[in-house]
Amino acid sequence: MSDTQNLEQLLEALMDAEDPKEVRRIAGSILTLDGSHPAGHLALWELMEEEESLNSLGQLEKALEETRKRVGGAPASLYDENPLTEIYGALLMHLAFGFHAKEELERALAFAQDLVAFDDEGVYPGRTVFYRCLLDLKQYDRILEALEEDPLETPVGEHARTLALLETKGVCDETMEALLNALSLDTNLPFLILDLTILPEEDEELGAELEETFHQAVYLQTPWTETQERASFLALPTLILGSLTGRLEQEDQEALEEMLKDSGLEDGVARLQAQAAERDADEDPDERDQWAMEELMKLLLPEGN
């Protein structure tokens, strides 16, 4: 068997390997045959503990440079048949999140921007770190410009839009409309951001969908809670939504009642709560959320929006 054929078999085996010892063995064999192969270096980096991995981002930068050299810049698309296509996306993802963790925001943003440009379907969580970097850098106009060009409408993007509008235009109908649109895209997300959701025990599975939402919440929590104005702006519609969908603990319900005082919304919320109480207790949660969001929009937005 030629070295090329052997290398191809090792790369296939690496994709299927799950045991860390097996991954390390296969990656070592790949690098014995091809000392600069990005797949081998990426696999070994992913086995590192967090501190070591952050101190070894230079290893990933070299692997990315080698990947770009081998594919002629960047893969044509997510579905480019070149075996390095997935490696390219993974390297950009790790570099963006890694440099953000090290608070090297401009470097993180550069890798995140490349990942978003490459991934127009949201396969990688690049938009999460991309918009978080822009929020950290307080580049609010750039957030709004990026959203105009982004082919995807995502919860994290719409939360970033809301925060950008809140900073550039303040509390207004446009900002509230943006927030309600963000909530409608993932109704669980604001509860995680505000720590209003009881998560499963550590040994229980979150489920793929909730895991993705949790990851987004981790990156949105700091921007949303940076000021009291931001936190309050998110909290009121979130608490109303929670009261209509059975998500609130007693103390959260009391917090809502306090926020409703002098808001002019008490009667409207009480009416909706009465309607919610009359709905089928076994109603599908997604249908309940859809009803609640429709009513929330009617309550908080002027007619015609």
Predicted features and spans:
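Flexible helix-coil transition and linker loops at the boundaries of alpha-helical arrays
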Residues: 30-33, 60-85, 116-118
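TPR/TPR-like (Sel1-like) alpha-helical repeat modules
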Residues: 52-69, 116-120, 135, 148-155, ...
